[in-house]
């Protein structure tokens, strides 16, 4: 299930909003010194400014058959309301069919990609984005972030920010030792009618970065 945590107006459908998992992100003193580290073993993301953690959050990683790439990268693109170019839905009137962009179910359908909010790309077709943070490898190589952490991560990541992805990170022994993790990964998927609409993208200003003490 992909958690979007979107709230509608009265009379509309309401999706569950989970507040138990809510990592705190802090503004950097020098944005040019920010580094993003990913531990595949512990499935954790550490956004660091020197030795100071700005955001520590769980992530979902790629399947063994579609692994998250390891290496040293840099942020190359950011799109707050990105949709997948590969996976999504085919729409014709009130009919919505899940599928891939390469295979339409018939004539007259239009393709709408799956929402990948707060997209932060570090390699062509690979990036961080909102999604269910499963405790086991689950993605096609991208790194999913919880809705309550993705906005802050998006604010911290700038074009050119270094991204280091490795099996382990030094921070695993301290920041990543028994961290809280989200438990809402198995929530039911939102309705397809929501996922194809602009309402799939939630922008919550309460998730802004905080000032460092």
List PLM regions with ranges.
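Exported/periplasmic cell-wall-interacting domains
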Residues: 12, 16-17, 24, 70, ...
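Short, charged beta-turn/beta-strand-edge "cap" motif at the junction between a beta-strand
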Residues: 51, 81, 169-172
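Bacterial N-terminal signal peptides
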Residues: 1-10
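Short, charged/polar surface micro-motifs in flexible loops or helix N-caps
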Residues: 80-82, 125
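Non-transmembrane, membrane-adjacent beta-strand/coil modules in membrane-associated proteins
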Residues: 83-87
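Alpha-helical hydrophobic/aromatic positions enriched in membrane-embedded helices and signal peptides
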Residues: 3, 31, 138-139
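Glycine-rich catalytic cores of cysteine/serine-nucleophile enzymes that process amide/ester linkages
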Residues: 40-44, 48-79
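Post-signal peptide N-terminal segment of mature Sec-exported envelope proteins
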Residues: 18-48
């Amino acid at each position: 299930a992909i958690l979007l945590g979107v709230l509608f107006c009265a009379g509309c459908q309401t999706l569950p909003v989970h507040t138990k998992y809510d990592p705190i992100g802090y503004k950097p003193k020098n944005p040019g010194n920010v580094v993003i580290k990913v531990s595949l073993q512990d499935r954790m993301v550490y956004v660091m400014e020197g030795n100071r953690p700005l955001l520590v959050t769980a992530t979902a990683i790629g399947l063994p058959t579609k692994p998250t790439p390891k290496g040293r990268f840099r942020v190359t693109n950011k799109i707050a309301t990105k949709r997948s170019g590969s996976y999504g839905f085919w729409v014709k009137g009130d009919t919505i069919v899940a599928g891939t962009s390469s295979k339409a179910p018939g004539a007259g359908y239009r393709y709408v990609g799956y929402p990948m909010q707060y997209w932060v790309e570090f390699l062509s077709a690979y990036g961080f984005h909102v999604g269910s943070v499963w405790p086991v490898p689950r993605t096609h190589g991208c790194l999913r972030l919880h809705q309550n952490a993705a906005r802050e991560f998006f604010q911290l990541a700038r074009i050119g920010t270094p991204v280091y992805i490795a099996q382990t990170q030094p921070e695993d022994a301290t920041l990543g030792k028994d961290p809280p993790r989200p438990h809402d990964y198995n929530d039911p998927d939102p309705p397809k009618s929501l996922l194809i609409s602009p309402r799939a993208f939630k922008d919550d200003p309460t998730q802004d970065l905080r000032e460092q003490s």
